Amino acid sequence: MLQTPSNLNRFKHLGLALSIFYLLYNLTTVYSVSLHTLYPSQIHNLTTPFDSMIPFIPAMIVPYSWSLILFVASFFLVRTSTQLSLLAYRLILATIFACLIFYFYPARFSFSRSIPDDWTQFGYQFLQLVDKPFNQLPSLHVSYAMLLGVSLWNVFESKKRWISVAYRLLLTSICTLIALSTVLTYQHHLLDMFGGVVLAVLVLILSNRIRNALVIKHLILGVIGFLLIAIAGFYFANMSMIASEVVEDLAIMIASYWLISFTMLAGVYQQVKPIRDIRWFQKSSSGRLTLHTWIKFAPIIIIYNGMSLFGQWYFKIFSKSQKYSLTPYAINDKVNVVASPRLMQTDLSSHLTYWLFGSSLLELRSSLESNRPAVCHQIIVVDLAAEISSHTHNLEIAANGIMNTTVHYLYLPLLDLQPLNDVLLQDYIDLFQKIEALIQSVETQAITANNESWVEGNQVEDSQVKGGLITLINFHCVMGLSRSIGVQVLYLLYCGTLTVYNYQSWIEQHYPHAHLKDTYLPQSLVETMANYKSVTY
């Protein structure tokens, strides 16, 4: 069943599309005006002999003004959430690609246009005030007209065929008049119009292949960052008395690096089932991002490290009010699990002490003072954060500072906000089976060591040895709000500890801060994992 978007969702999509347009369009306009003032020879002239044959028709200011009206109205005319998302994708892609071209190929309308002395003069006066004669190729009016026409083509259906035909003829006429008005009002040249058509066709092809909003999000961030850095470098260079070319070139290099990194990340999100291919975010055996990964994604890694610091602050604030407690959950008397953000070195020791021994060290002291074997611990760190290094290395140091504890490291590179059903089920099963193998392995090793100790007269029952072994499984991501909790829930479903009937109430009880929407942790994945019970506790 097709889902009808809410008015709030329509306004959100409209606000995003308009915000990106006004930010980037005005940014490139200001840049072009400054460039024309300082270096007029760098502004291109796109006049052709055919442009002089085109008449100026003042009344065409009316259909020219329809562009914004149709732009806004289209978000309330589409009928389904899919149509709404596709509409927003198309308009945003056209905007960011056009503004990149405006930066790399700045052009200016070359004809002089006098303001008519009739009823249209107010429209042209307003146009002259808000729209400078730059940002020419491609014409966004033309691109938007084509994209809006295609996006609205199927939104109106009637049992009477002539009504549907009339609607489409009206839509075609409006979009055609908008496109023609760009040259008949002397706002654009013919090449600009042609460029707008080409851009619209490319966007239509690309938008139908984009998997989700995360791809668009990172393309937007890449283009916005590029333009802000490059244009800021241009102004700093022209304010600098020395080495102005060096400053501008350096800014362009940094901006290009930013754009390439975010474009590559968008490409990773575009991949279907990308987890098996971990070459994008490689890590060492101790969970540290490799140099190769840093070279590719340094801007993203720096941003996520900042988010990690924010996550630490978030945790401390809510832990004071006891709303956010990193308390391990006991699957049974041998295995505990806990989901967390990536923890800082300064916080690891206190967290680890609490995870292993609770609020005091009485258990540890009593085991050391008695003749019974001390409780032995092993820690399995499951790293789910592709964008930052794990805390495994520092946790191992902290664990050895408290007592001799074995730390194992497992890595499943999930991308931020990537729906958990994007991962192959077998990847989850492989991870969970590795966890089970480590749990079984440490028990076997402990029993073997106990059997070898008989010569010293210290042998104890195997049941006592098993009872003295505790495994702590730490699922961690960047901020501890989605990935770590979501995969922990899947593991508990896999173990049979949770069911499809109680997992949501369990999340609300243990992680009320969690950000797990149905689109992120879909019911279908929960049901599949709950039915895949290979271990009985």
What annotation goes with each model-predicted range?
Residues W162-I163, Y167-L170, G195-I220:
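Functional transmembrane or membrane-interface alpha-helices that line membrane-embedded catalytic
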Residues R211-S308, I317, D430-N451, G467-N474, ...:
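PTP/DSP superfamily signal
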Residues T120-L129, V142, F310-I447, G467-F475, ...:
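Cysteine-based protein phosphatase catalytic domain of the PTP/DSP
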Residues V62-L70, S139-L147, F194-V198:
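Membrane-embedded alpha-helical segments of multi-pass membrane proteins
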Residues Y22-N26, T95-Y103, S173-V183, L227-F236:
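Aromatic-anchored segments of alpha-helical transmembrane domains
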Residues M1-L70, I115, T120, Y124, ...:
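N-terminal transmembrane-helix/juxtamembrane module of multi-pass inner/ER membrane proteins
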Residues F134-L137, T176-V203:
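Interfacial helix-loop-helix junctions of multi-pass membrane proteins
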Residues V33-P49, L77-T172, I178, L204, ...:
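Membrane-interface loops
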